[in-house]
Design a protein with these regions (language model features):
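Topological signature of polytopic alpha-helical transporters
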Residues: 1-2, 24-26, 31, 46, ...
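Conserved catalytic motifs of ABC-family nucleotide-binding domains
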Residues: 4, 36-37, 48-59, 72-73
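Helix-to-loop junction immediately C-terminal to a conserved catalytic motif
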Residues: 11-17
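Helix N-cap at the start of a conserved alpha-helix in ABC-type nucleotide-binding domains
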Residues: 141-142
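Catalytic Walker B motif of ABC-type/P-loop ATPase nucleotide-binding domains
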Residues: 130-134
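Alpha-helical transmembrane segments and their short interhelical loops
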Residues: 157, 163-164, 169-173, 178-181, ...
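A short, proline-enriched helix->beta-strand linker immediately N-terminal to the Walker B motif
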Residues: 123-128
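Hydrophobic anchor residue at the start of the ABC signature
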Residues: 119-120, 147
Length: 432
């Protein structure tokens, strides 16, 4: 249920405890402590789809493949890997379509396609396990079914898929192999998903016939705060589930069963610890700094070039403001009043350049902040490479400032000496 601690548990399991968070106990993988490169071996997909609207699905995947796969991997092999992943996620029909943005501001993928694209971004380095925070959130039942079917296929290809989910439909619930039920931050059940209904029957809570088990679990495990009596009853019920799970040792039994499965796989030769240690993470370290800078610069230039409306509006406003400013100060004299007017004109030039240069950049960094945080948490690139790539990508925008300053300079009638004009432009460029 809502507020049961699902995202917190997922963050702990995936090794992404927020800064300042306090963790007691330990997390083990196959009975052993997590290795230093654990985060490189797993993928974490956030609930929010954090993607660049102007890139296509293929471009998005290829960028992350080039950033996160080893430099020794040929581009042809990376492209083939990306195409296989696109096919696995059912995105072949939108391979070359722009991702777009939610709400239809920039048209692109549907909600379910965006979810699958968001998953694919974290799958390009072929992780051994993938953690997902409510991958069906905000989707209709059909799109949710498609997303979970894609995840089921990924699990069938030898990957471990761990996801939190809120009130799935019955057909989605039937896809689960293992199930953990949390209530009020405590364990209520863990084990085979097919055994959950029977377990609750032993507690005298029987799932009605023709009822979705997930809906039944939500009903009996949720806290009801509509009145004190209902809160007390639901609190007693939740405490009962937590006590029973603890007294029956469900957590210990599930852990023991998992370790037995690993031991059996080792005996049968299906699991080679040494081999897994060297091959489960394909990326011992992705692209170098120079490659990161080049790829991020390419991405920034593509997004800027394809934002036709944004670029057009910027140029249009610069030209309009230049003409208005020129109309106000055109033909000023060389007397004391004219000098003061020229100083006023220069002040407005500086003011326009300062605001028109700074505000778009501030808005851009704010818009991309969450994407960058997600990508850096995955180890995609260095902060310095991203920052410098954005600076380089902003250079073409100086052309509109060049037009603005040129129009104002010559229409108003500043010093016609070419050297003075070039000095003026140099100062303007430095200010931008």
């Amino acid at each position: 249920p809502t507020g049961s601690g699902k995202p917190s548990l997922l963050n702990v399991l995936s090794g992404r405890v927020p800064a300042g968070g306090i963790l007691s106990g330990e997390v083990t993988v196959n009975g052993q402590a997590r290795s230093e490169d654990f985060n490189e071996r797993v993928a974490y997909v956030m609930q929010e789809e954090l993607l660049f609207a102007f890139l296509t699905v293929h471009e998005t995947f290829m960028l992350h493949a080039r950033l996160r796969l080893p430099p020794s991997t040929p581009d042809k092999e990376k492209a083939e890997s990306v195409d296989r992943l696109i096919a696995e996620l059912g995105l072949k029909n939108v391979r070359d379509s722009p991702v777009g943005s939610p709400g239809g501001f920039r048209r692109g993928l549907s909600g379910g396609e965006r979810k699958r694209c968001n998953i694919g971004v974290e799958m390009v380095h072929d992780p051994a396990a993938i953690f997902l925070d409510e991958p069906t959130s905000g989707l209709d039942s059909f799109q949710a079914q498609n997303v979970m079917s894609a995840l089921r296929d990924l699990a069938g290809n030898g990957r471990s898929v761990v996801c939190t989910i809120h009130q799935p439909r019955s057909s989605i619930f039937a896809m689960f192999d293992q199930l953990m039920l949390l209530t009020d931050g405590r364990l209520a059940f863990i084990g085979d998903a097919s055994a959950a209904v029977g377990y609750f029957e032993t507690l005298m809570f029987k799932c009605p016939t023709l009822t979705n088990p997930a809906d039944f679990f939500m009903d009996v495990m949720s806290m009801d705060f509509r009145s004190e009596s209902r809160e007390g009853n639901s609190r007693s019920r939740v405490d009962f589930f937590a006590r029973e799970a603890a007294s029956r040792g469900l957590g210990e039994a599930a852990a023991s069963k998992a370790l037995e499965s690993v031991a059996l796989a080792k005996r049968q030769g299906a699991f080679d610890g040494e081999k897994e240690e060297t091959t489960s993470a394909k990326s011992p370290g992705g692209a170098g700094w120079a490659t990161q800078f080049y790829l991020l610069s390419q991405r920034a230039h593509k997004c800027q070039r394809r934002d036709v409306v944004g670029v057009g509006v910027t140029v249009f406003l610069d030209v309009v403001y230049a003409l208005l400013l020129s109309a106000l100060y055109r033909g000023v004299g060389d007397d004391q009043e004219g000098v003061q007017n020229r100083l006023g004109c220069l002040f407005f030039i500086c003011l326009n350049l300062a605001y028109s240069s700074a505000l778009p950049s501030i808005n851009l960094f704010a818009a991309e902040k969450n994407i960058v945080i997600r990508e850096q948490a995955s180890g995609a690139y260095a902060t310095s490479a991203y920052y410098l790539s954005k600076l380089v990508a902003e250079l073409p925008k100086l052309s509109s400032k060049f037009v603005f300053c040129t129009l104002v300079y010559w229409i108003v009638g500043f010093n016609p000496d070419p050297t003075r004009y070039l000095n003026f432009l140099l100062i303007v460029i430095c200010e931008c």
